[in-house]
Amino acid sequence: MEYLSIGSPEKKYRLVILTDMENEPDDSQTMVRLLMYSNEIDIEGLIAVTSKWLPRLVFPESITARVNAYGVVRKNLVKHAAGWPSEQYLLDRVAGGQRGYGMSAVGDGKSTEGSELIIKAVDKEDSRPIWFAINAGANTLAQALWDVRKTRSPEEVAAFVKKVKVYDDSGQDDAGAWIAHTFPDLFYIRSRSQVFVLDAPMTAYRRIVMDVKQAI
């Protein structure tokens, strides 16, 4: 089993974040926290997407604002550790995803800056896989996979899918189920309990224990 070791100088993990910024304060808070660890990972995308409670709007400008704030303090961060990405590097990886909810916003002619950024990141000449942390809806990743499946050979699709690893927080639209069903070889983890940690830690703990027992 492979374990993710934060801070390992030999190997940084590649990461794309899908987040429904402006839905709730926790999305902005976790974005700030991520930036405080951005020297430990290779951030490949910061994509504003929709979710159940934010079904029609995306706010990439809110990600941009947090990256701008990171740029202000970066000069202090570099005094303590190496590897901090430049503000411009991160800004170049901010994008907006599907402006609609779930699979209703996925299909031919529905590509977005976010879905195109995903394809570009996965296609990069880099043998490392990309982890997708989906803290909202998954339909922007679904759109990227839709476009790849429509335009490439089965062998090329398989090579693309092999590089994608997903951690999905609670399945906040129907796109995650479509991805898992359509691409059964794609590495996909769904947490059914993470979101409950926000306001009921003990409830979340009990749910996690139940999930583990069911898995065993």
Which residue stretches match the model-derived regions?
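N-terminal acidic, glycine/proline-rich low-complexity segments
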Residues: 2-216
